[in-house]
A protein has these predicted regions:
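Nucleotide-activated donor-dependent transferases that construct or modify glycoconjugates
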Residues: 2-14
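Glycine- and acidic-residue-enriched helix-capping/strand-helix junction motifs
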Residues: 12-23
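Glycine-rich beta-alpha loop elements in corrinoid/cobalamin-binding modules
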Residues: 2, 29-146
Length: 146
């Protein structure tokens, strides 16, 4: 199964970029588990939303993950919405990071394009989640998700 992890675009005139280590850690765990993973750091690559959508289309993942802190949370939802509208409604969308961990119920109610939220540290939860999605198993009793 293919998984894409995305750091959303940022549009600040002056900003200091630092790598999103969380996405790297999650990618390493998923690769260890045999998943084909691509990380897209739209901020570092100066990608627009259109550029991110093209990357998703080219890679054709079954699951996309994004999230982060509150300032980029809506950008993640823009990516999820466009991916489901323009590529496939079957793409499983997963958000994580501080914003979604603390506002999980509100986020799921506000964003219909959001399928799952991983709360807290995501490495092992994402591993279990991806294994279940790949096997077509239910997620109901999976710990660490909303």
């Amino acid at each position: 199964m293919r998984v894409m992890l995305i750091q959303p675009p940022m549009y600040h005139l002056k900003m200091q970029l630092s790598p999103n280590l969380g996405l790297g850690y999650i990618a390493a765990v998923l690769e260890r588990d045999g998943f084909e993973v691509q990380v897209v750091d739209a901020a570092a690559e100066s990608l627009s939303f259109d550029g991110v959508i093209e990357r998703i289309r080219a890679f054709n993942p079954s699951l996309i993950g994004a999230g982060g802190q509150t300032p980029v949370s809506r950008r993640s939802m823009t990516i999820f919405g466009r991916a489901k509208e323009e590529i496939s409604r079957d793409i499983v969308t997963v958000a994580g990071g501080p914003h979604f961990s603390f506002a999980d119920s509100e986020s799921l109610a506000e964003y219909p394009q959001l399928d799952v939220i991983v709360r807290g540290e995501g490495e092992e939860t994402m591993s279990c989640l991806c294994k279940r999605v790949a096997a077509g198993e239910p997620l109901d009793d999976l710990r660490g998700i909303s």
